[in-house]
């Protein structure tokens, strides 16, 4: 055995050993319990970042722990390979997105392998490969035929200069990110998934997810947004019907969760696209201008929430069905046409947004809720409007004095009797629009035929292959300019037809990849029935909290779609979810001449610390001049505070990177990068290596202690007690608690006690062998390379076949225990007594303790309090 720890030598050797033994390559095995561990697959952006390292190390720790515990473990890996960044990089570098993506995959794959992850690379998938997205297209056609996928007009951000549709994140302050042009809203045909058909099941099944963080489930519940309310129809005033047709000429329909406040409505607001707005603007240029303004800018709901609320009156009126009041109709930029009915009733006295709008335009406010005897206070909406328990109606005629529920039911009865409304359950969730007017995505398998309409591509003609030798120019969709792609014949009539040139939202690929891993080479469907039955749901899923809503919701939705197609036999895709925290690091900058900030990498900064170790000043190493310390933030390119994992691996080895990531913080919390923490992790590994080296140097490996320990010295019994209590704790930390930092700390404490114990005797060496063999197995999930190497020196066998250390219950039973002795509540000594010592024996031993005698100062004991197994307190 080499004297010094050399990760550059031992890590490739350990990885080769695992690869040769194929320890990560699994198949269905009914003789073992299965464990499917999955970390969210990466986007192949070019290089791994520390967030990747943390995510995949957590997954590997859990996988290796289960492997040693006899499970048939599947830990696959793949690439979420479609998406906008590839198009942007392609335009920047004049290279096809496919070439850029495949190069990145190869490099990132070597990085992942260098970290020693126990990944079954034979299950690797890349979502941009036709053999993957073929089955996505197949499911799309099946769902289109069933009506779960449908086509309708949707609103998008249109860049009039680049002649292209922009994603919400590409719109910056209302302008295109590349052209700088003012963005317009456009209505174009798009494909949608009827996720709303599954809203109730998606909501209810959250209760099945016992091992998901409550925070994530709450976020999904809020996103689905089930509410009980009423549809209310305001009759259009006779003098306001001009230009309106059908039901729009009869009534304006709104949805409200607070029909009890209907008597407090003082105006109604409609979206710019509402037919009433269009009719009102027919002869009013000022309305036309405002509607045009509303149609410009982002369509993102988040932007709508924060922008300035604006509106114009239409001069049209509707009638409140409860009291006959005429309410003016306003066009408002905060009302969205695609949500609900595109109209809202406004109750300024009891809603903050309505109040601000009414105050801005001097509109009336009418109080209809009172809380106790308090006078109305416009600054307390949450109390007046949100409090459904304590408020009662006022200024509401015969409804006065009613509480929320009674008023709700009374209003519902009145409106229903008039045909002016009915109770309704509504969801915030909207159908999922999956059409993207971009190139680097999965083609939508639809053919447009003038005679037959929209025709799904037959299964035997799938996949519709995306051409890969395309370099986008940012000016519209490349596919729409490629007759060789879109010119085709209709599958129904054989006539000339045109392929759909939109591609799918990249959330589509990540909504089912976990099923494809089960049988990645299966050529007859999305997943083989045998594999789906064996692997079932993912047992452990790991990823960032930023995916709590959309990705996880769509994955749950797809699972139910695939279940209903008979493809899988589970209702939910992920049994247990761990959302790891971010990796954060200090940030530094200097202000530049343009008033902006030039961010400086932490590696280029030299710090000065105060006597408590806190940074007080920083200078740039290159010139010695000051830089601003800006606090810790998530590692990112924009703040230039990232640390390249490859540099860390090259300098310290993969095990040091893994150990630091697992020891620095609990997995669900943010991890603050620390160079000293990395160095500390490396020191511990050197110490572990040195401990085994020194042990073997003194006489080589022996048979580990097992059996009856009655003949051992007290010191060796104490060491075995520490070993087996540590094994029990670490097993719980890995399995139930998933707190890896405390598992590492427990092994460190074990080694501390080992160092203090005399193990020079024959029995001592046997116990030492037992301790060291257990320690390297306990640490193998986290630092597998060094542990694999040390195990081969200690045992000569294959660690992955050794199994998890078992707990010797006899070793946990101590014949003697140490008990604290207090006098008047202050620690004054310790006594060693038999573990089964009686209360009288404990009292006698405490009274005889030298420290107790000294501080009792000859006074008699008034009372003696005994806490069995812990302490004796003498009160004098």
Swiss-Prot record:
Gene3D superfamilies xref list: 2.20.28.290, 3.10.20.590, HUPs (3.40.50.620), Isoleucyl-tRNA Synthetase, Domain 1 (1.10.730.10), Valyl/Leucyl/Isoleucyl-tRNA synthetase, editing domain (3.90.740.10)
Keyword field: Aminoacyl-tRNA synthetase, ATP-binding, Cytoplasm, Ligase, Nucleotide-binding, Protein biosynthesis
Catalyzed reaction equations: tRNA(Leu) + L-leucine + ATP = L-leucyl-tRNA(Leu) + AMP + diphosphate
Motif 'HIGH' region per record, residues: 42-52
Disulfides per UniProt: none
Annotated GO biological process: leucyl-tRNA aminoacylation
Annotated PROSITE patterns: AA_TRNA_LIGASE_I (PS00178)
GO cellular component: cytosol
Claim: Metal-binding is one of the keywords in the record: no
EC number, UniProt record: 6.1.1.4
Motif ('KMSKS' region): 634-638
UniProt binding sites for ATP: 637
A molecular function (GO) term: aminoacyl-tRNA deacylase activity
Localization (cell): Cytoplasm
Transmembrane domains' residue ranges: none
Main location (coarse class): cytoplasm
EC class of the enzyme, as a word: ligase
Family classification: Belongs to the class-I aminoacyl-tRNA synthetase family.
Name of the protein: Leucine--tRNA ligase
Species whose genome carries this gene: Neisseria gonorrhoeae (strain NCCP11945)
Lineage, highest ranks first: Bacteria, Pseudomonadati, Pseudomonadota, Betaproteobacteria, Neisseriales
Protein's gene: leuS
């Amino acid at each position: 055995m080499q004297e010094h720890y050399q990760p550059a030598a031992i890590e490739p050797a350990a990885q080769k050993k695992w690869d040769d033994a194929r320890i990560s390559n699994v198949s269905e095995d009914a003789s073992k319990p299965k464990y499917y561990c999955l970390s969210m697959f990466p986007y192949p952006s070019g290089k791994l970042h520390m967030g990747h390292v943390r995510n995949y190390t957590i997954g590997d720790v859990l996988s290796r722990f289960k492997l040693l515990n006899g499970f048939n473990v599947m830990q696959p890996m793949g690439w979420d390979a479609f998406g906008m960044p590839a198009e942007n990089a392609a335009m920047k570098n004049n290279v096809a997105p496919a070439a850029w993506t495949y190069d990145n995959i190869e490099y990132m794959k070597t990085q992942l392998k260098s970290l020693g992850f126990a990944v079954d690379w034979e299950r690797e998938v890349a979502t941009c490969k036709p053999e993957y997205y073929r089955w996505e297209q197949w499911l799309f056609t099946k769902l289109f035929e069933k009506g779960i996928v449908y086509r309708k007009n949707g609103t998008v951000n249109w860049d009039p200069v680049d002649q292209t549709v922009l994603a919400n994140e590409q719109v910056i302050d209302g302008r295109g990110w590349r052209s700088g042009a003012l963005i317009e809203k456009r209505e174009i045909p798009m494909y949608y998934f009827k996720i709303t058909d599954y809203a109730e099941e998606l909501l209810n099944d959250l209760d099945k997810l016992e091992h998901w963080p409550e925070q994530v489930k709450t976020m999904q519940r809020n996103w689905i947004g089930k509410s009980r309310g009423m549809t209310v129809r305001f009759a259009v005033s006779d003098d306001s019907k001009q230009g309106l047709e059908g039901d729009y000429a009869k009534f304006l329909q709104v949805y409200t969760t607070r029909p009890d406040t209907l008597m407090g409505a003082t105006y109604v607001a409609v979206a710019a696209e509402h037919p009433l707005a269009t009719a009102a603007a027919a002869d009013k240029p000022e309305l036309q201008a405002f509607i045009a303004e509303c149609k410009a800018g982002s369509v993102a709901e988040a932007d709508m929430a924060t922008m300035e609320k604006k509106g114009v009156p239409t001069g049209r009126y509707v009638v409140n069905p409860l009291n006959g009041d005429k309410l003016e109709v306003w066009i408002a930029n905060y009302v969205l046409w695609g949500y609900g009915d595109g109209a809202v009733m406004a109750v300024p006295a009891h809603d903050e947004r309505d109040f601000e709008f009414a105050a801005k335009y001097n509109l009336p406010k009418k109080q209809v809720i009172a809380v106790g005897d308090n006078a109305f206070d416009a600054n307390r909406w949450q109390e007046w409007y949100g409090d459904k328990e304590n408020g009662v109606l006022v200024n509401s005629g015969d409804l006065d004095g009613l509480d929320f529920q009674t008023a709700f039911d009374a209003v519902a009865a009145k409106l229903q009797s008039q045909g002016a409304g009915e109770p309704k359950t509504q969801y915030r969730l909207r159908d999922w629009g999956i059409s993207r007017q971009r190139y680097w995505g999965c083609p939508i398998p639809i053919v447009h035929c003038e005679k037959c309409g929209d025709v799904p591509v037959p299964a035997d003609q799938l996949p519709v292959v995306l051409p890969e030798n395309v370099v986008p120019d940012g000016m519209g969709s490349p596919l729409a300019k490629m007759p060789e792609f879109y010119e085709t014949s209709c599958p129904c009539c054989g006539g000339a037809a045109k392929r759909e040139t939109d591609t799918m939202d990249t959330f589509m690929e990540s909504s089912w990849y976990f099923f494809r891993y089960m049988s990645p080479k299966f050529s007859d469907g999305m997943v083989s029935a045998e594999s789906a039955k064996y692997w079932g749901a993912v047992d452990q899923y790991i990823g960032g909290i930023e995916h709590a809503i959309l990705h996880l919701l769509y994955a749950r939705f797809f699972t139910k779609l695939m279940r209903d197609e008979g493809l899988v036999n589970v209702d939910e895709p992920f049994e247990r979810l761990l959302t790891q925290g971010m990796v954060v690091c200090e940030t530094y900058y200097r202000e530049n001449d343009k008033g902006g900030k030039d961010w400086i990498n932490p590696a280029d900064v030299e710090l000065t610390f105060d006597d408590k170790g806190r940074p007080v000043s920083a200078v740039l190493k290159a010139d010695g001049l000051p830089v601003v310390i800006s606090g810790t933030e998530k590692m990112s390119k924009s703040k230039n505070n990232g640390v390249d994992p490859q540099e860390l691996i090259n300098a310290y080895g993969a095990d040091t990177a893994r150990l630091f990531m697992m020891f620095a913080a609990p997995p669900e919390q943010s991890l603050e990068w620390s160079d000293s923490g990395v160095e500390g992790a490396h020191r511990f590994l050197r110490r572990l290596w040195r401990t085994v080296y020194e042990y073997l140097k003194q006489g080589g490996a022996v048979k580990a202690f097992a059996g009856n320990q009655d003949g051992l010295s007290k010191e060796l019994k104490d060491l075995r007690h520490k070993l087996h209590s540590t094994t029990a704790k670490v097993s719980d930390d890995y399995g139930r608690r998933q707190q890896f930092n405390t598992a590492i700390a427990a092994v460190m404490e074990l080694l501390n006690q080992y160092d203090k114990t005399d193990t020079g005797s024959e029995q001592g060496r046997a116990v030492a062998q037992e301790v060291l063999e257990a320690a390297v197995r306990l640490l193998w999930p986290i630092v597998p390379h060094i542990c694999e190497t040390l195990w081969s020196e200690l045992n000569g066998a294959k660690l992955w076949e050794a199994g998890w250390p078992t707990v010797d219950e006899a070793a946990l039973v101590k014949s003697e225990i140490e008990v604290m002795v207090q006098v008047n509540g202050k620690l004054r000594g310790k006594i060693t007594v038999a573990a089964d010592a009686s209360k009288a024996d404990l009292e006698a031993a405490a009274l005889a303790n030298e420290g107790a005698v000294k501080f009792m100062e000859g006074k008699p004991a008034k009372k003696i309090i005994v806490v069995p197994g812990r302490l004796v307190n003498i009160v004098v």
